[in-house]
Amino acid sequence: LPLAGISLAFTEYRGVKAPEFVGLDNFVRMFEAPGFWTAFLNTLKLSVVKLLLNTLMAVVISLLLNEIKNMAFKKTTQTIIYLPHFMSWVVTVSVFSLILSPSQDGLVNTLLVNAGILEQGQEIYFMGSKDWWTSIFYIINVWKDTGWGTIIFLATLSGISPELYEAATMDG
């Protein structure tokens, strides 16, 4: 199937009719489209920041988990951190949409109104606001994807011999 997709990129696809070979015309049209470079740079920025945040959080959490001596607590914490990885994106976004909803059901806006930070009727539409959207995107991605990286880094840290830690302590 990947080869079929690659070959279709060089054709004018016409549904049930046979595709017509157009060479690089599709790529030229894509690169000349008015919003292409904006979309490309936005995607690149979101991907790089997401990668850095997920890696940083996974390393920090795995270092903290590696220091826990109570195995029952450690395993429970690992499970809780890893669990969001198994949720579908539809469920994840639905849950966050409910939590961040500007209606009376939205937990965050309700807390902000009850704390006196916002007035009733001034609730924030987090998922639809251009000021909040990127932050929410990063929060959701870190919450969902950090568990996987944490497990990988923790497995690596667990493989380090305790004798190396002792030698490092003695060496200073």
Where are these regions (language model features)?
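A structural signal for multi-pass alpha-helical bundles of membrane permease subunits
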Residues: 1-171
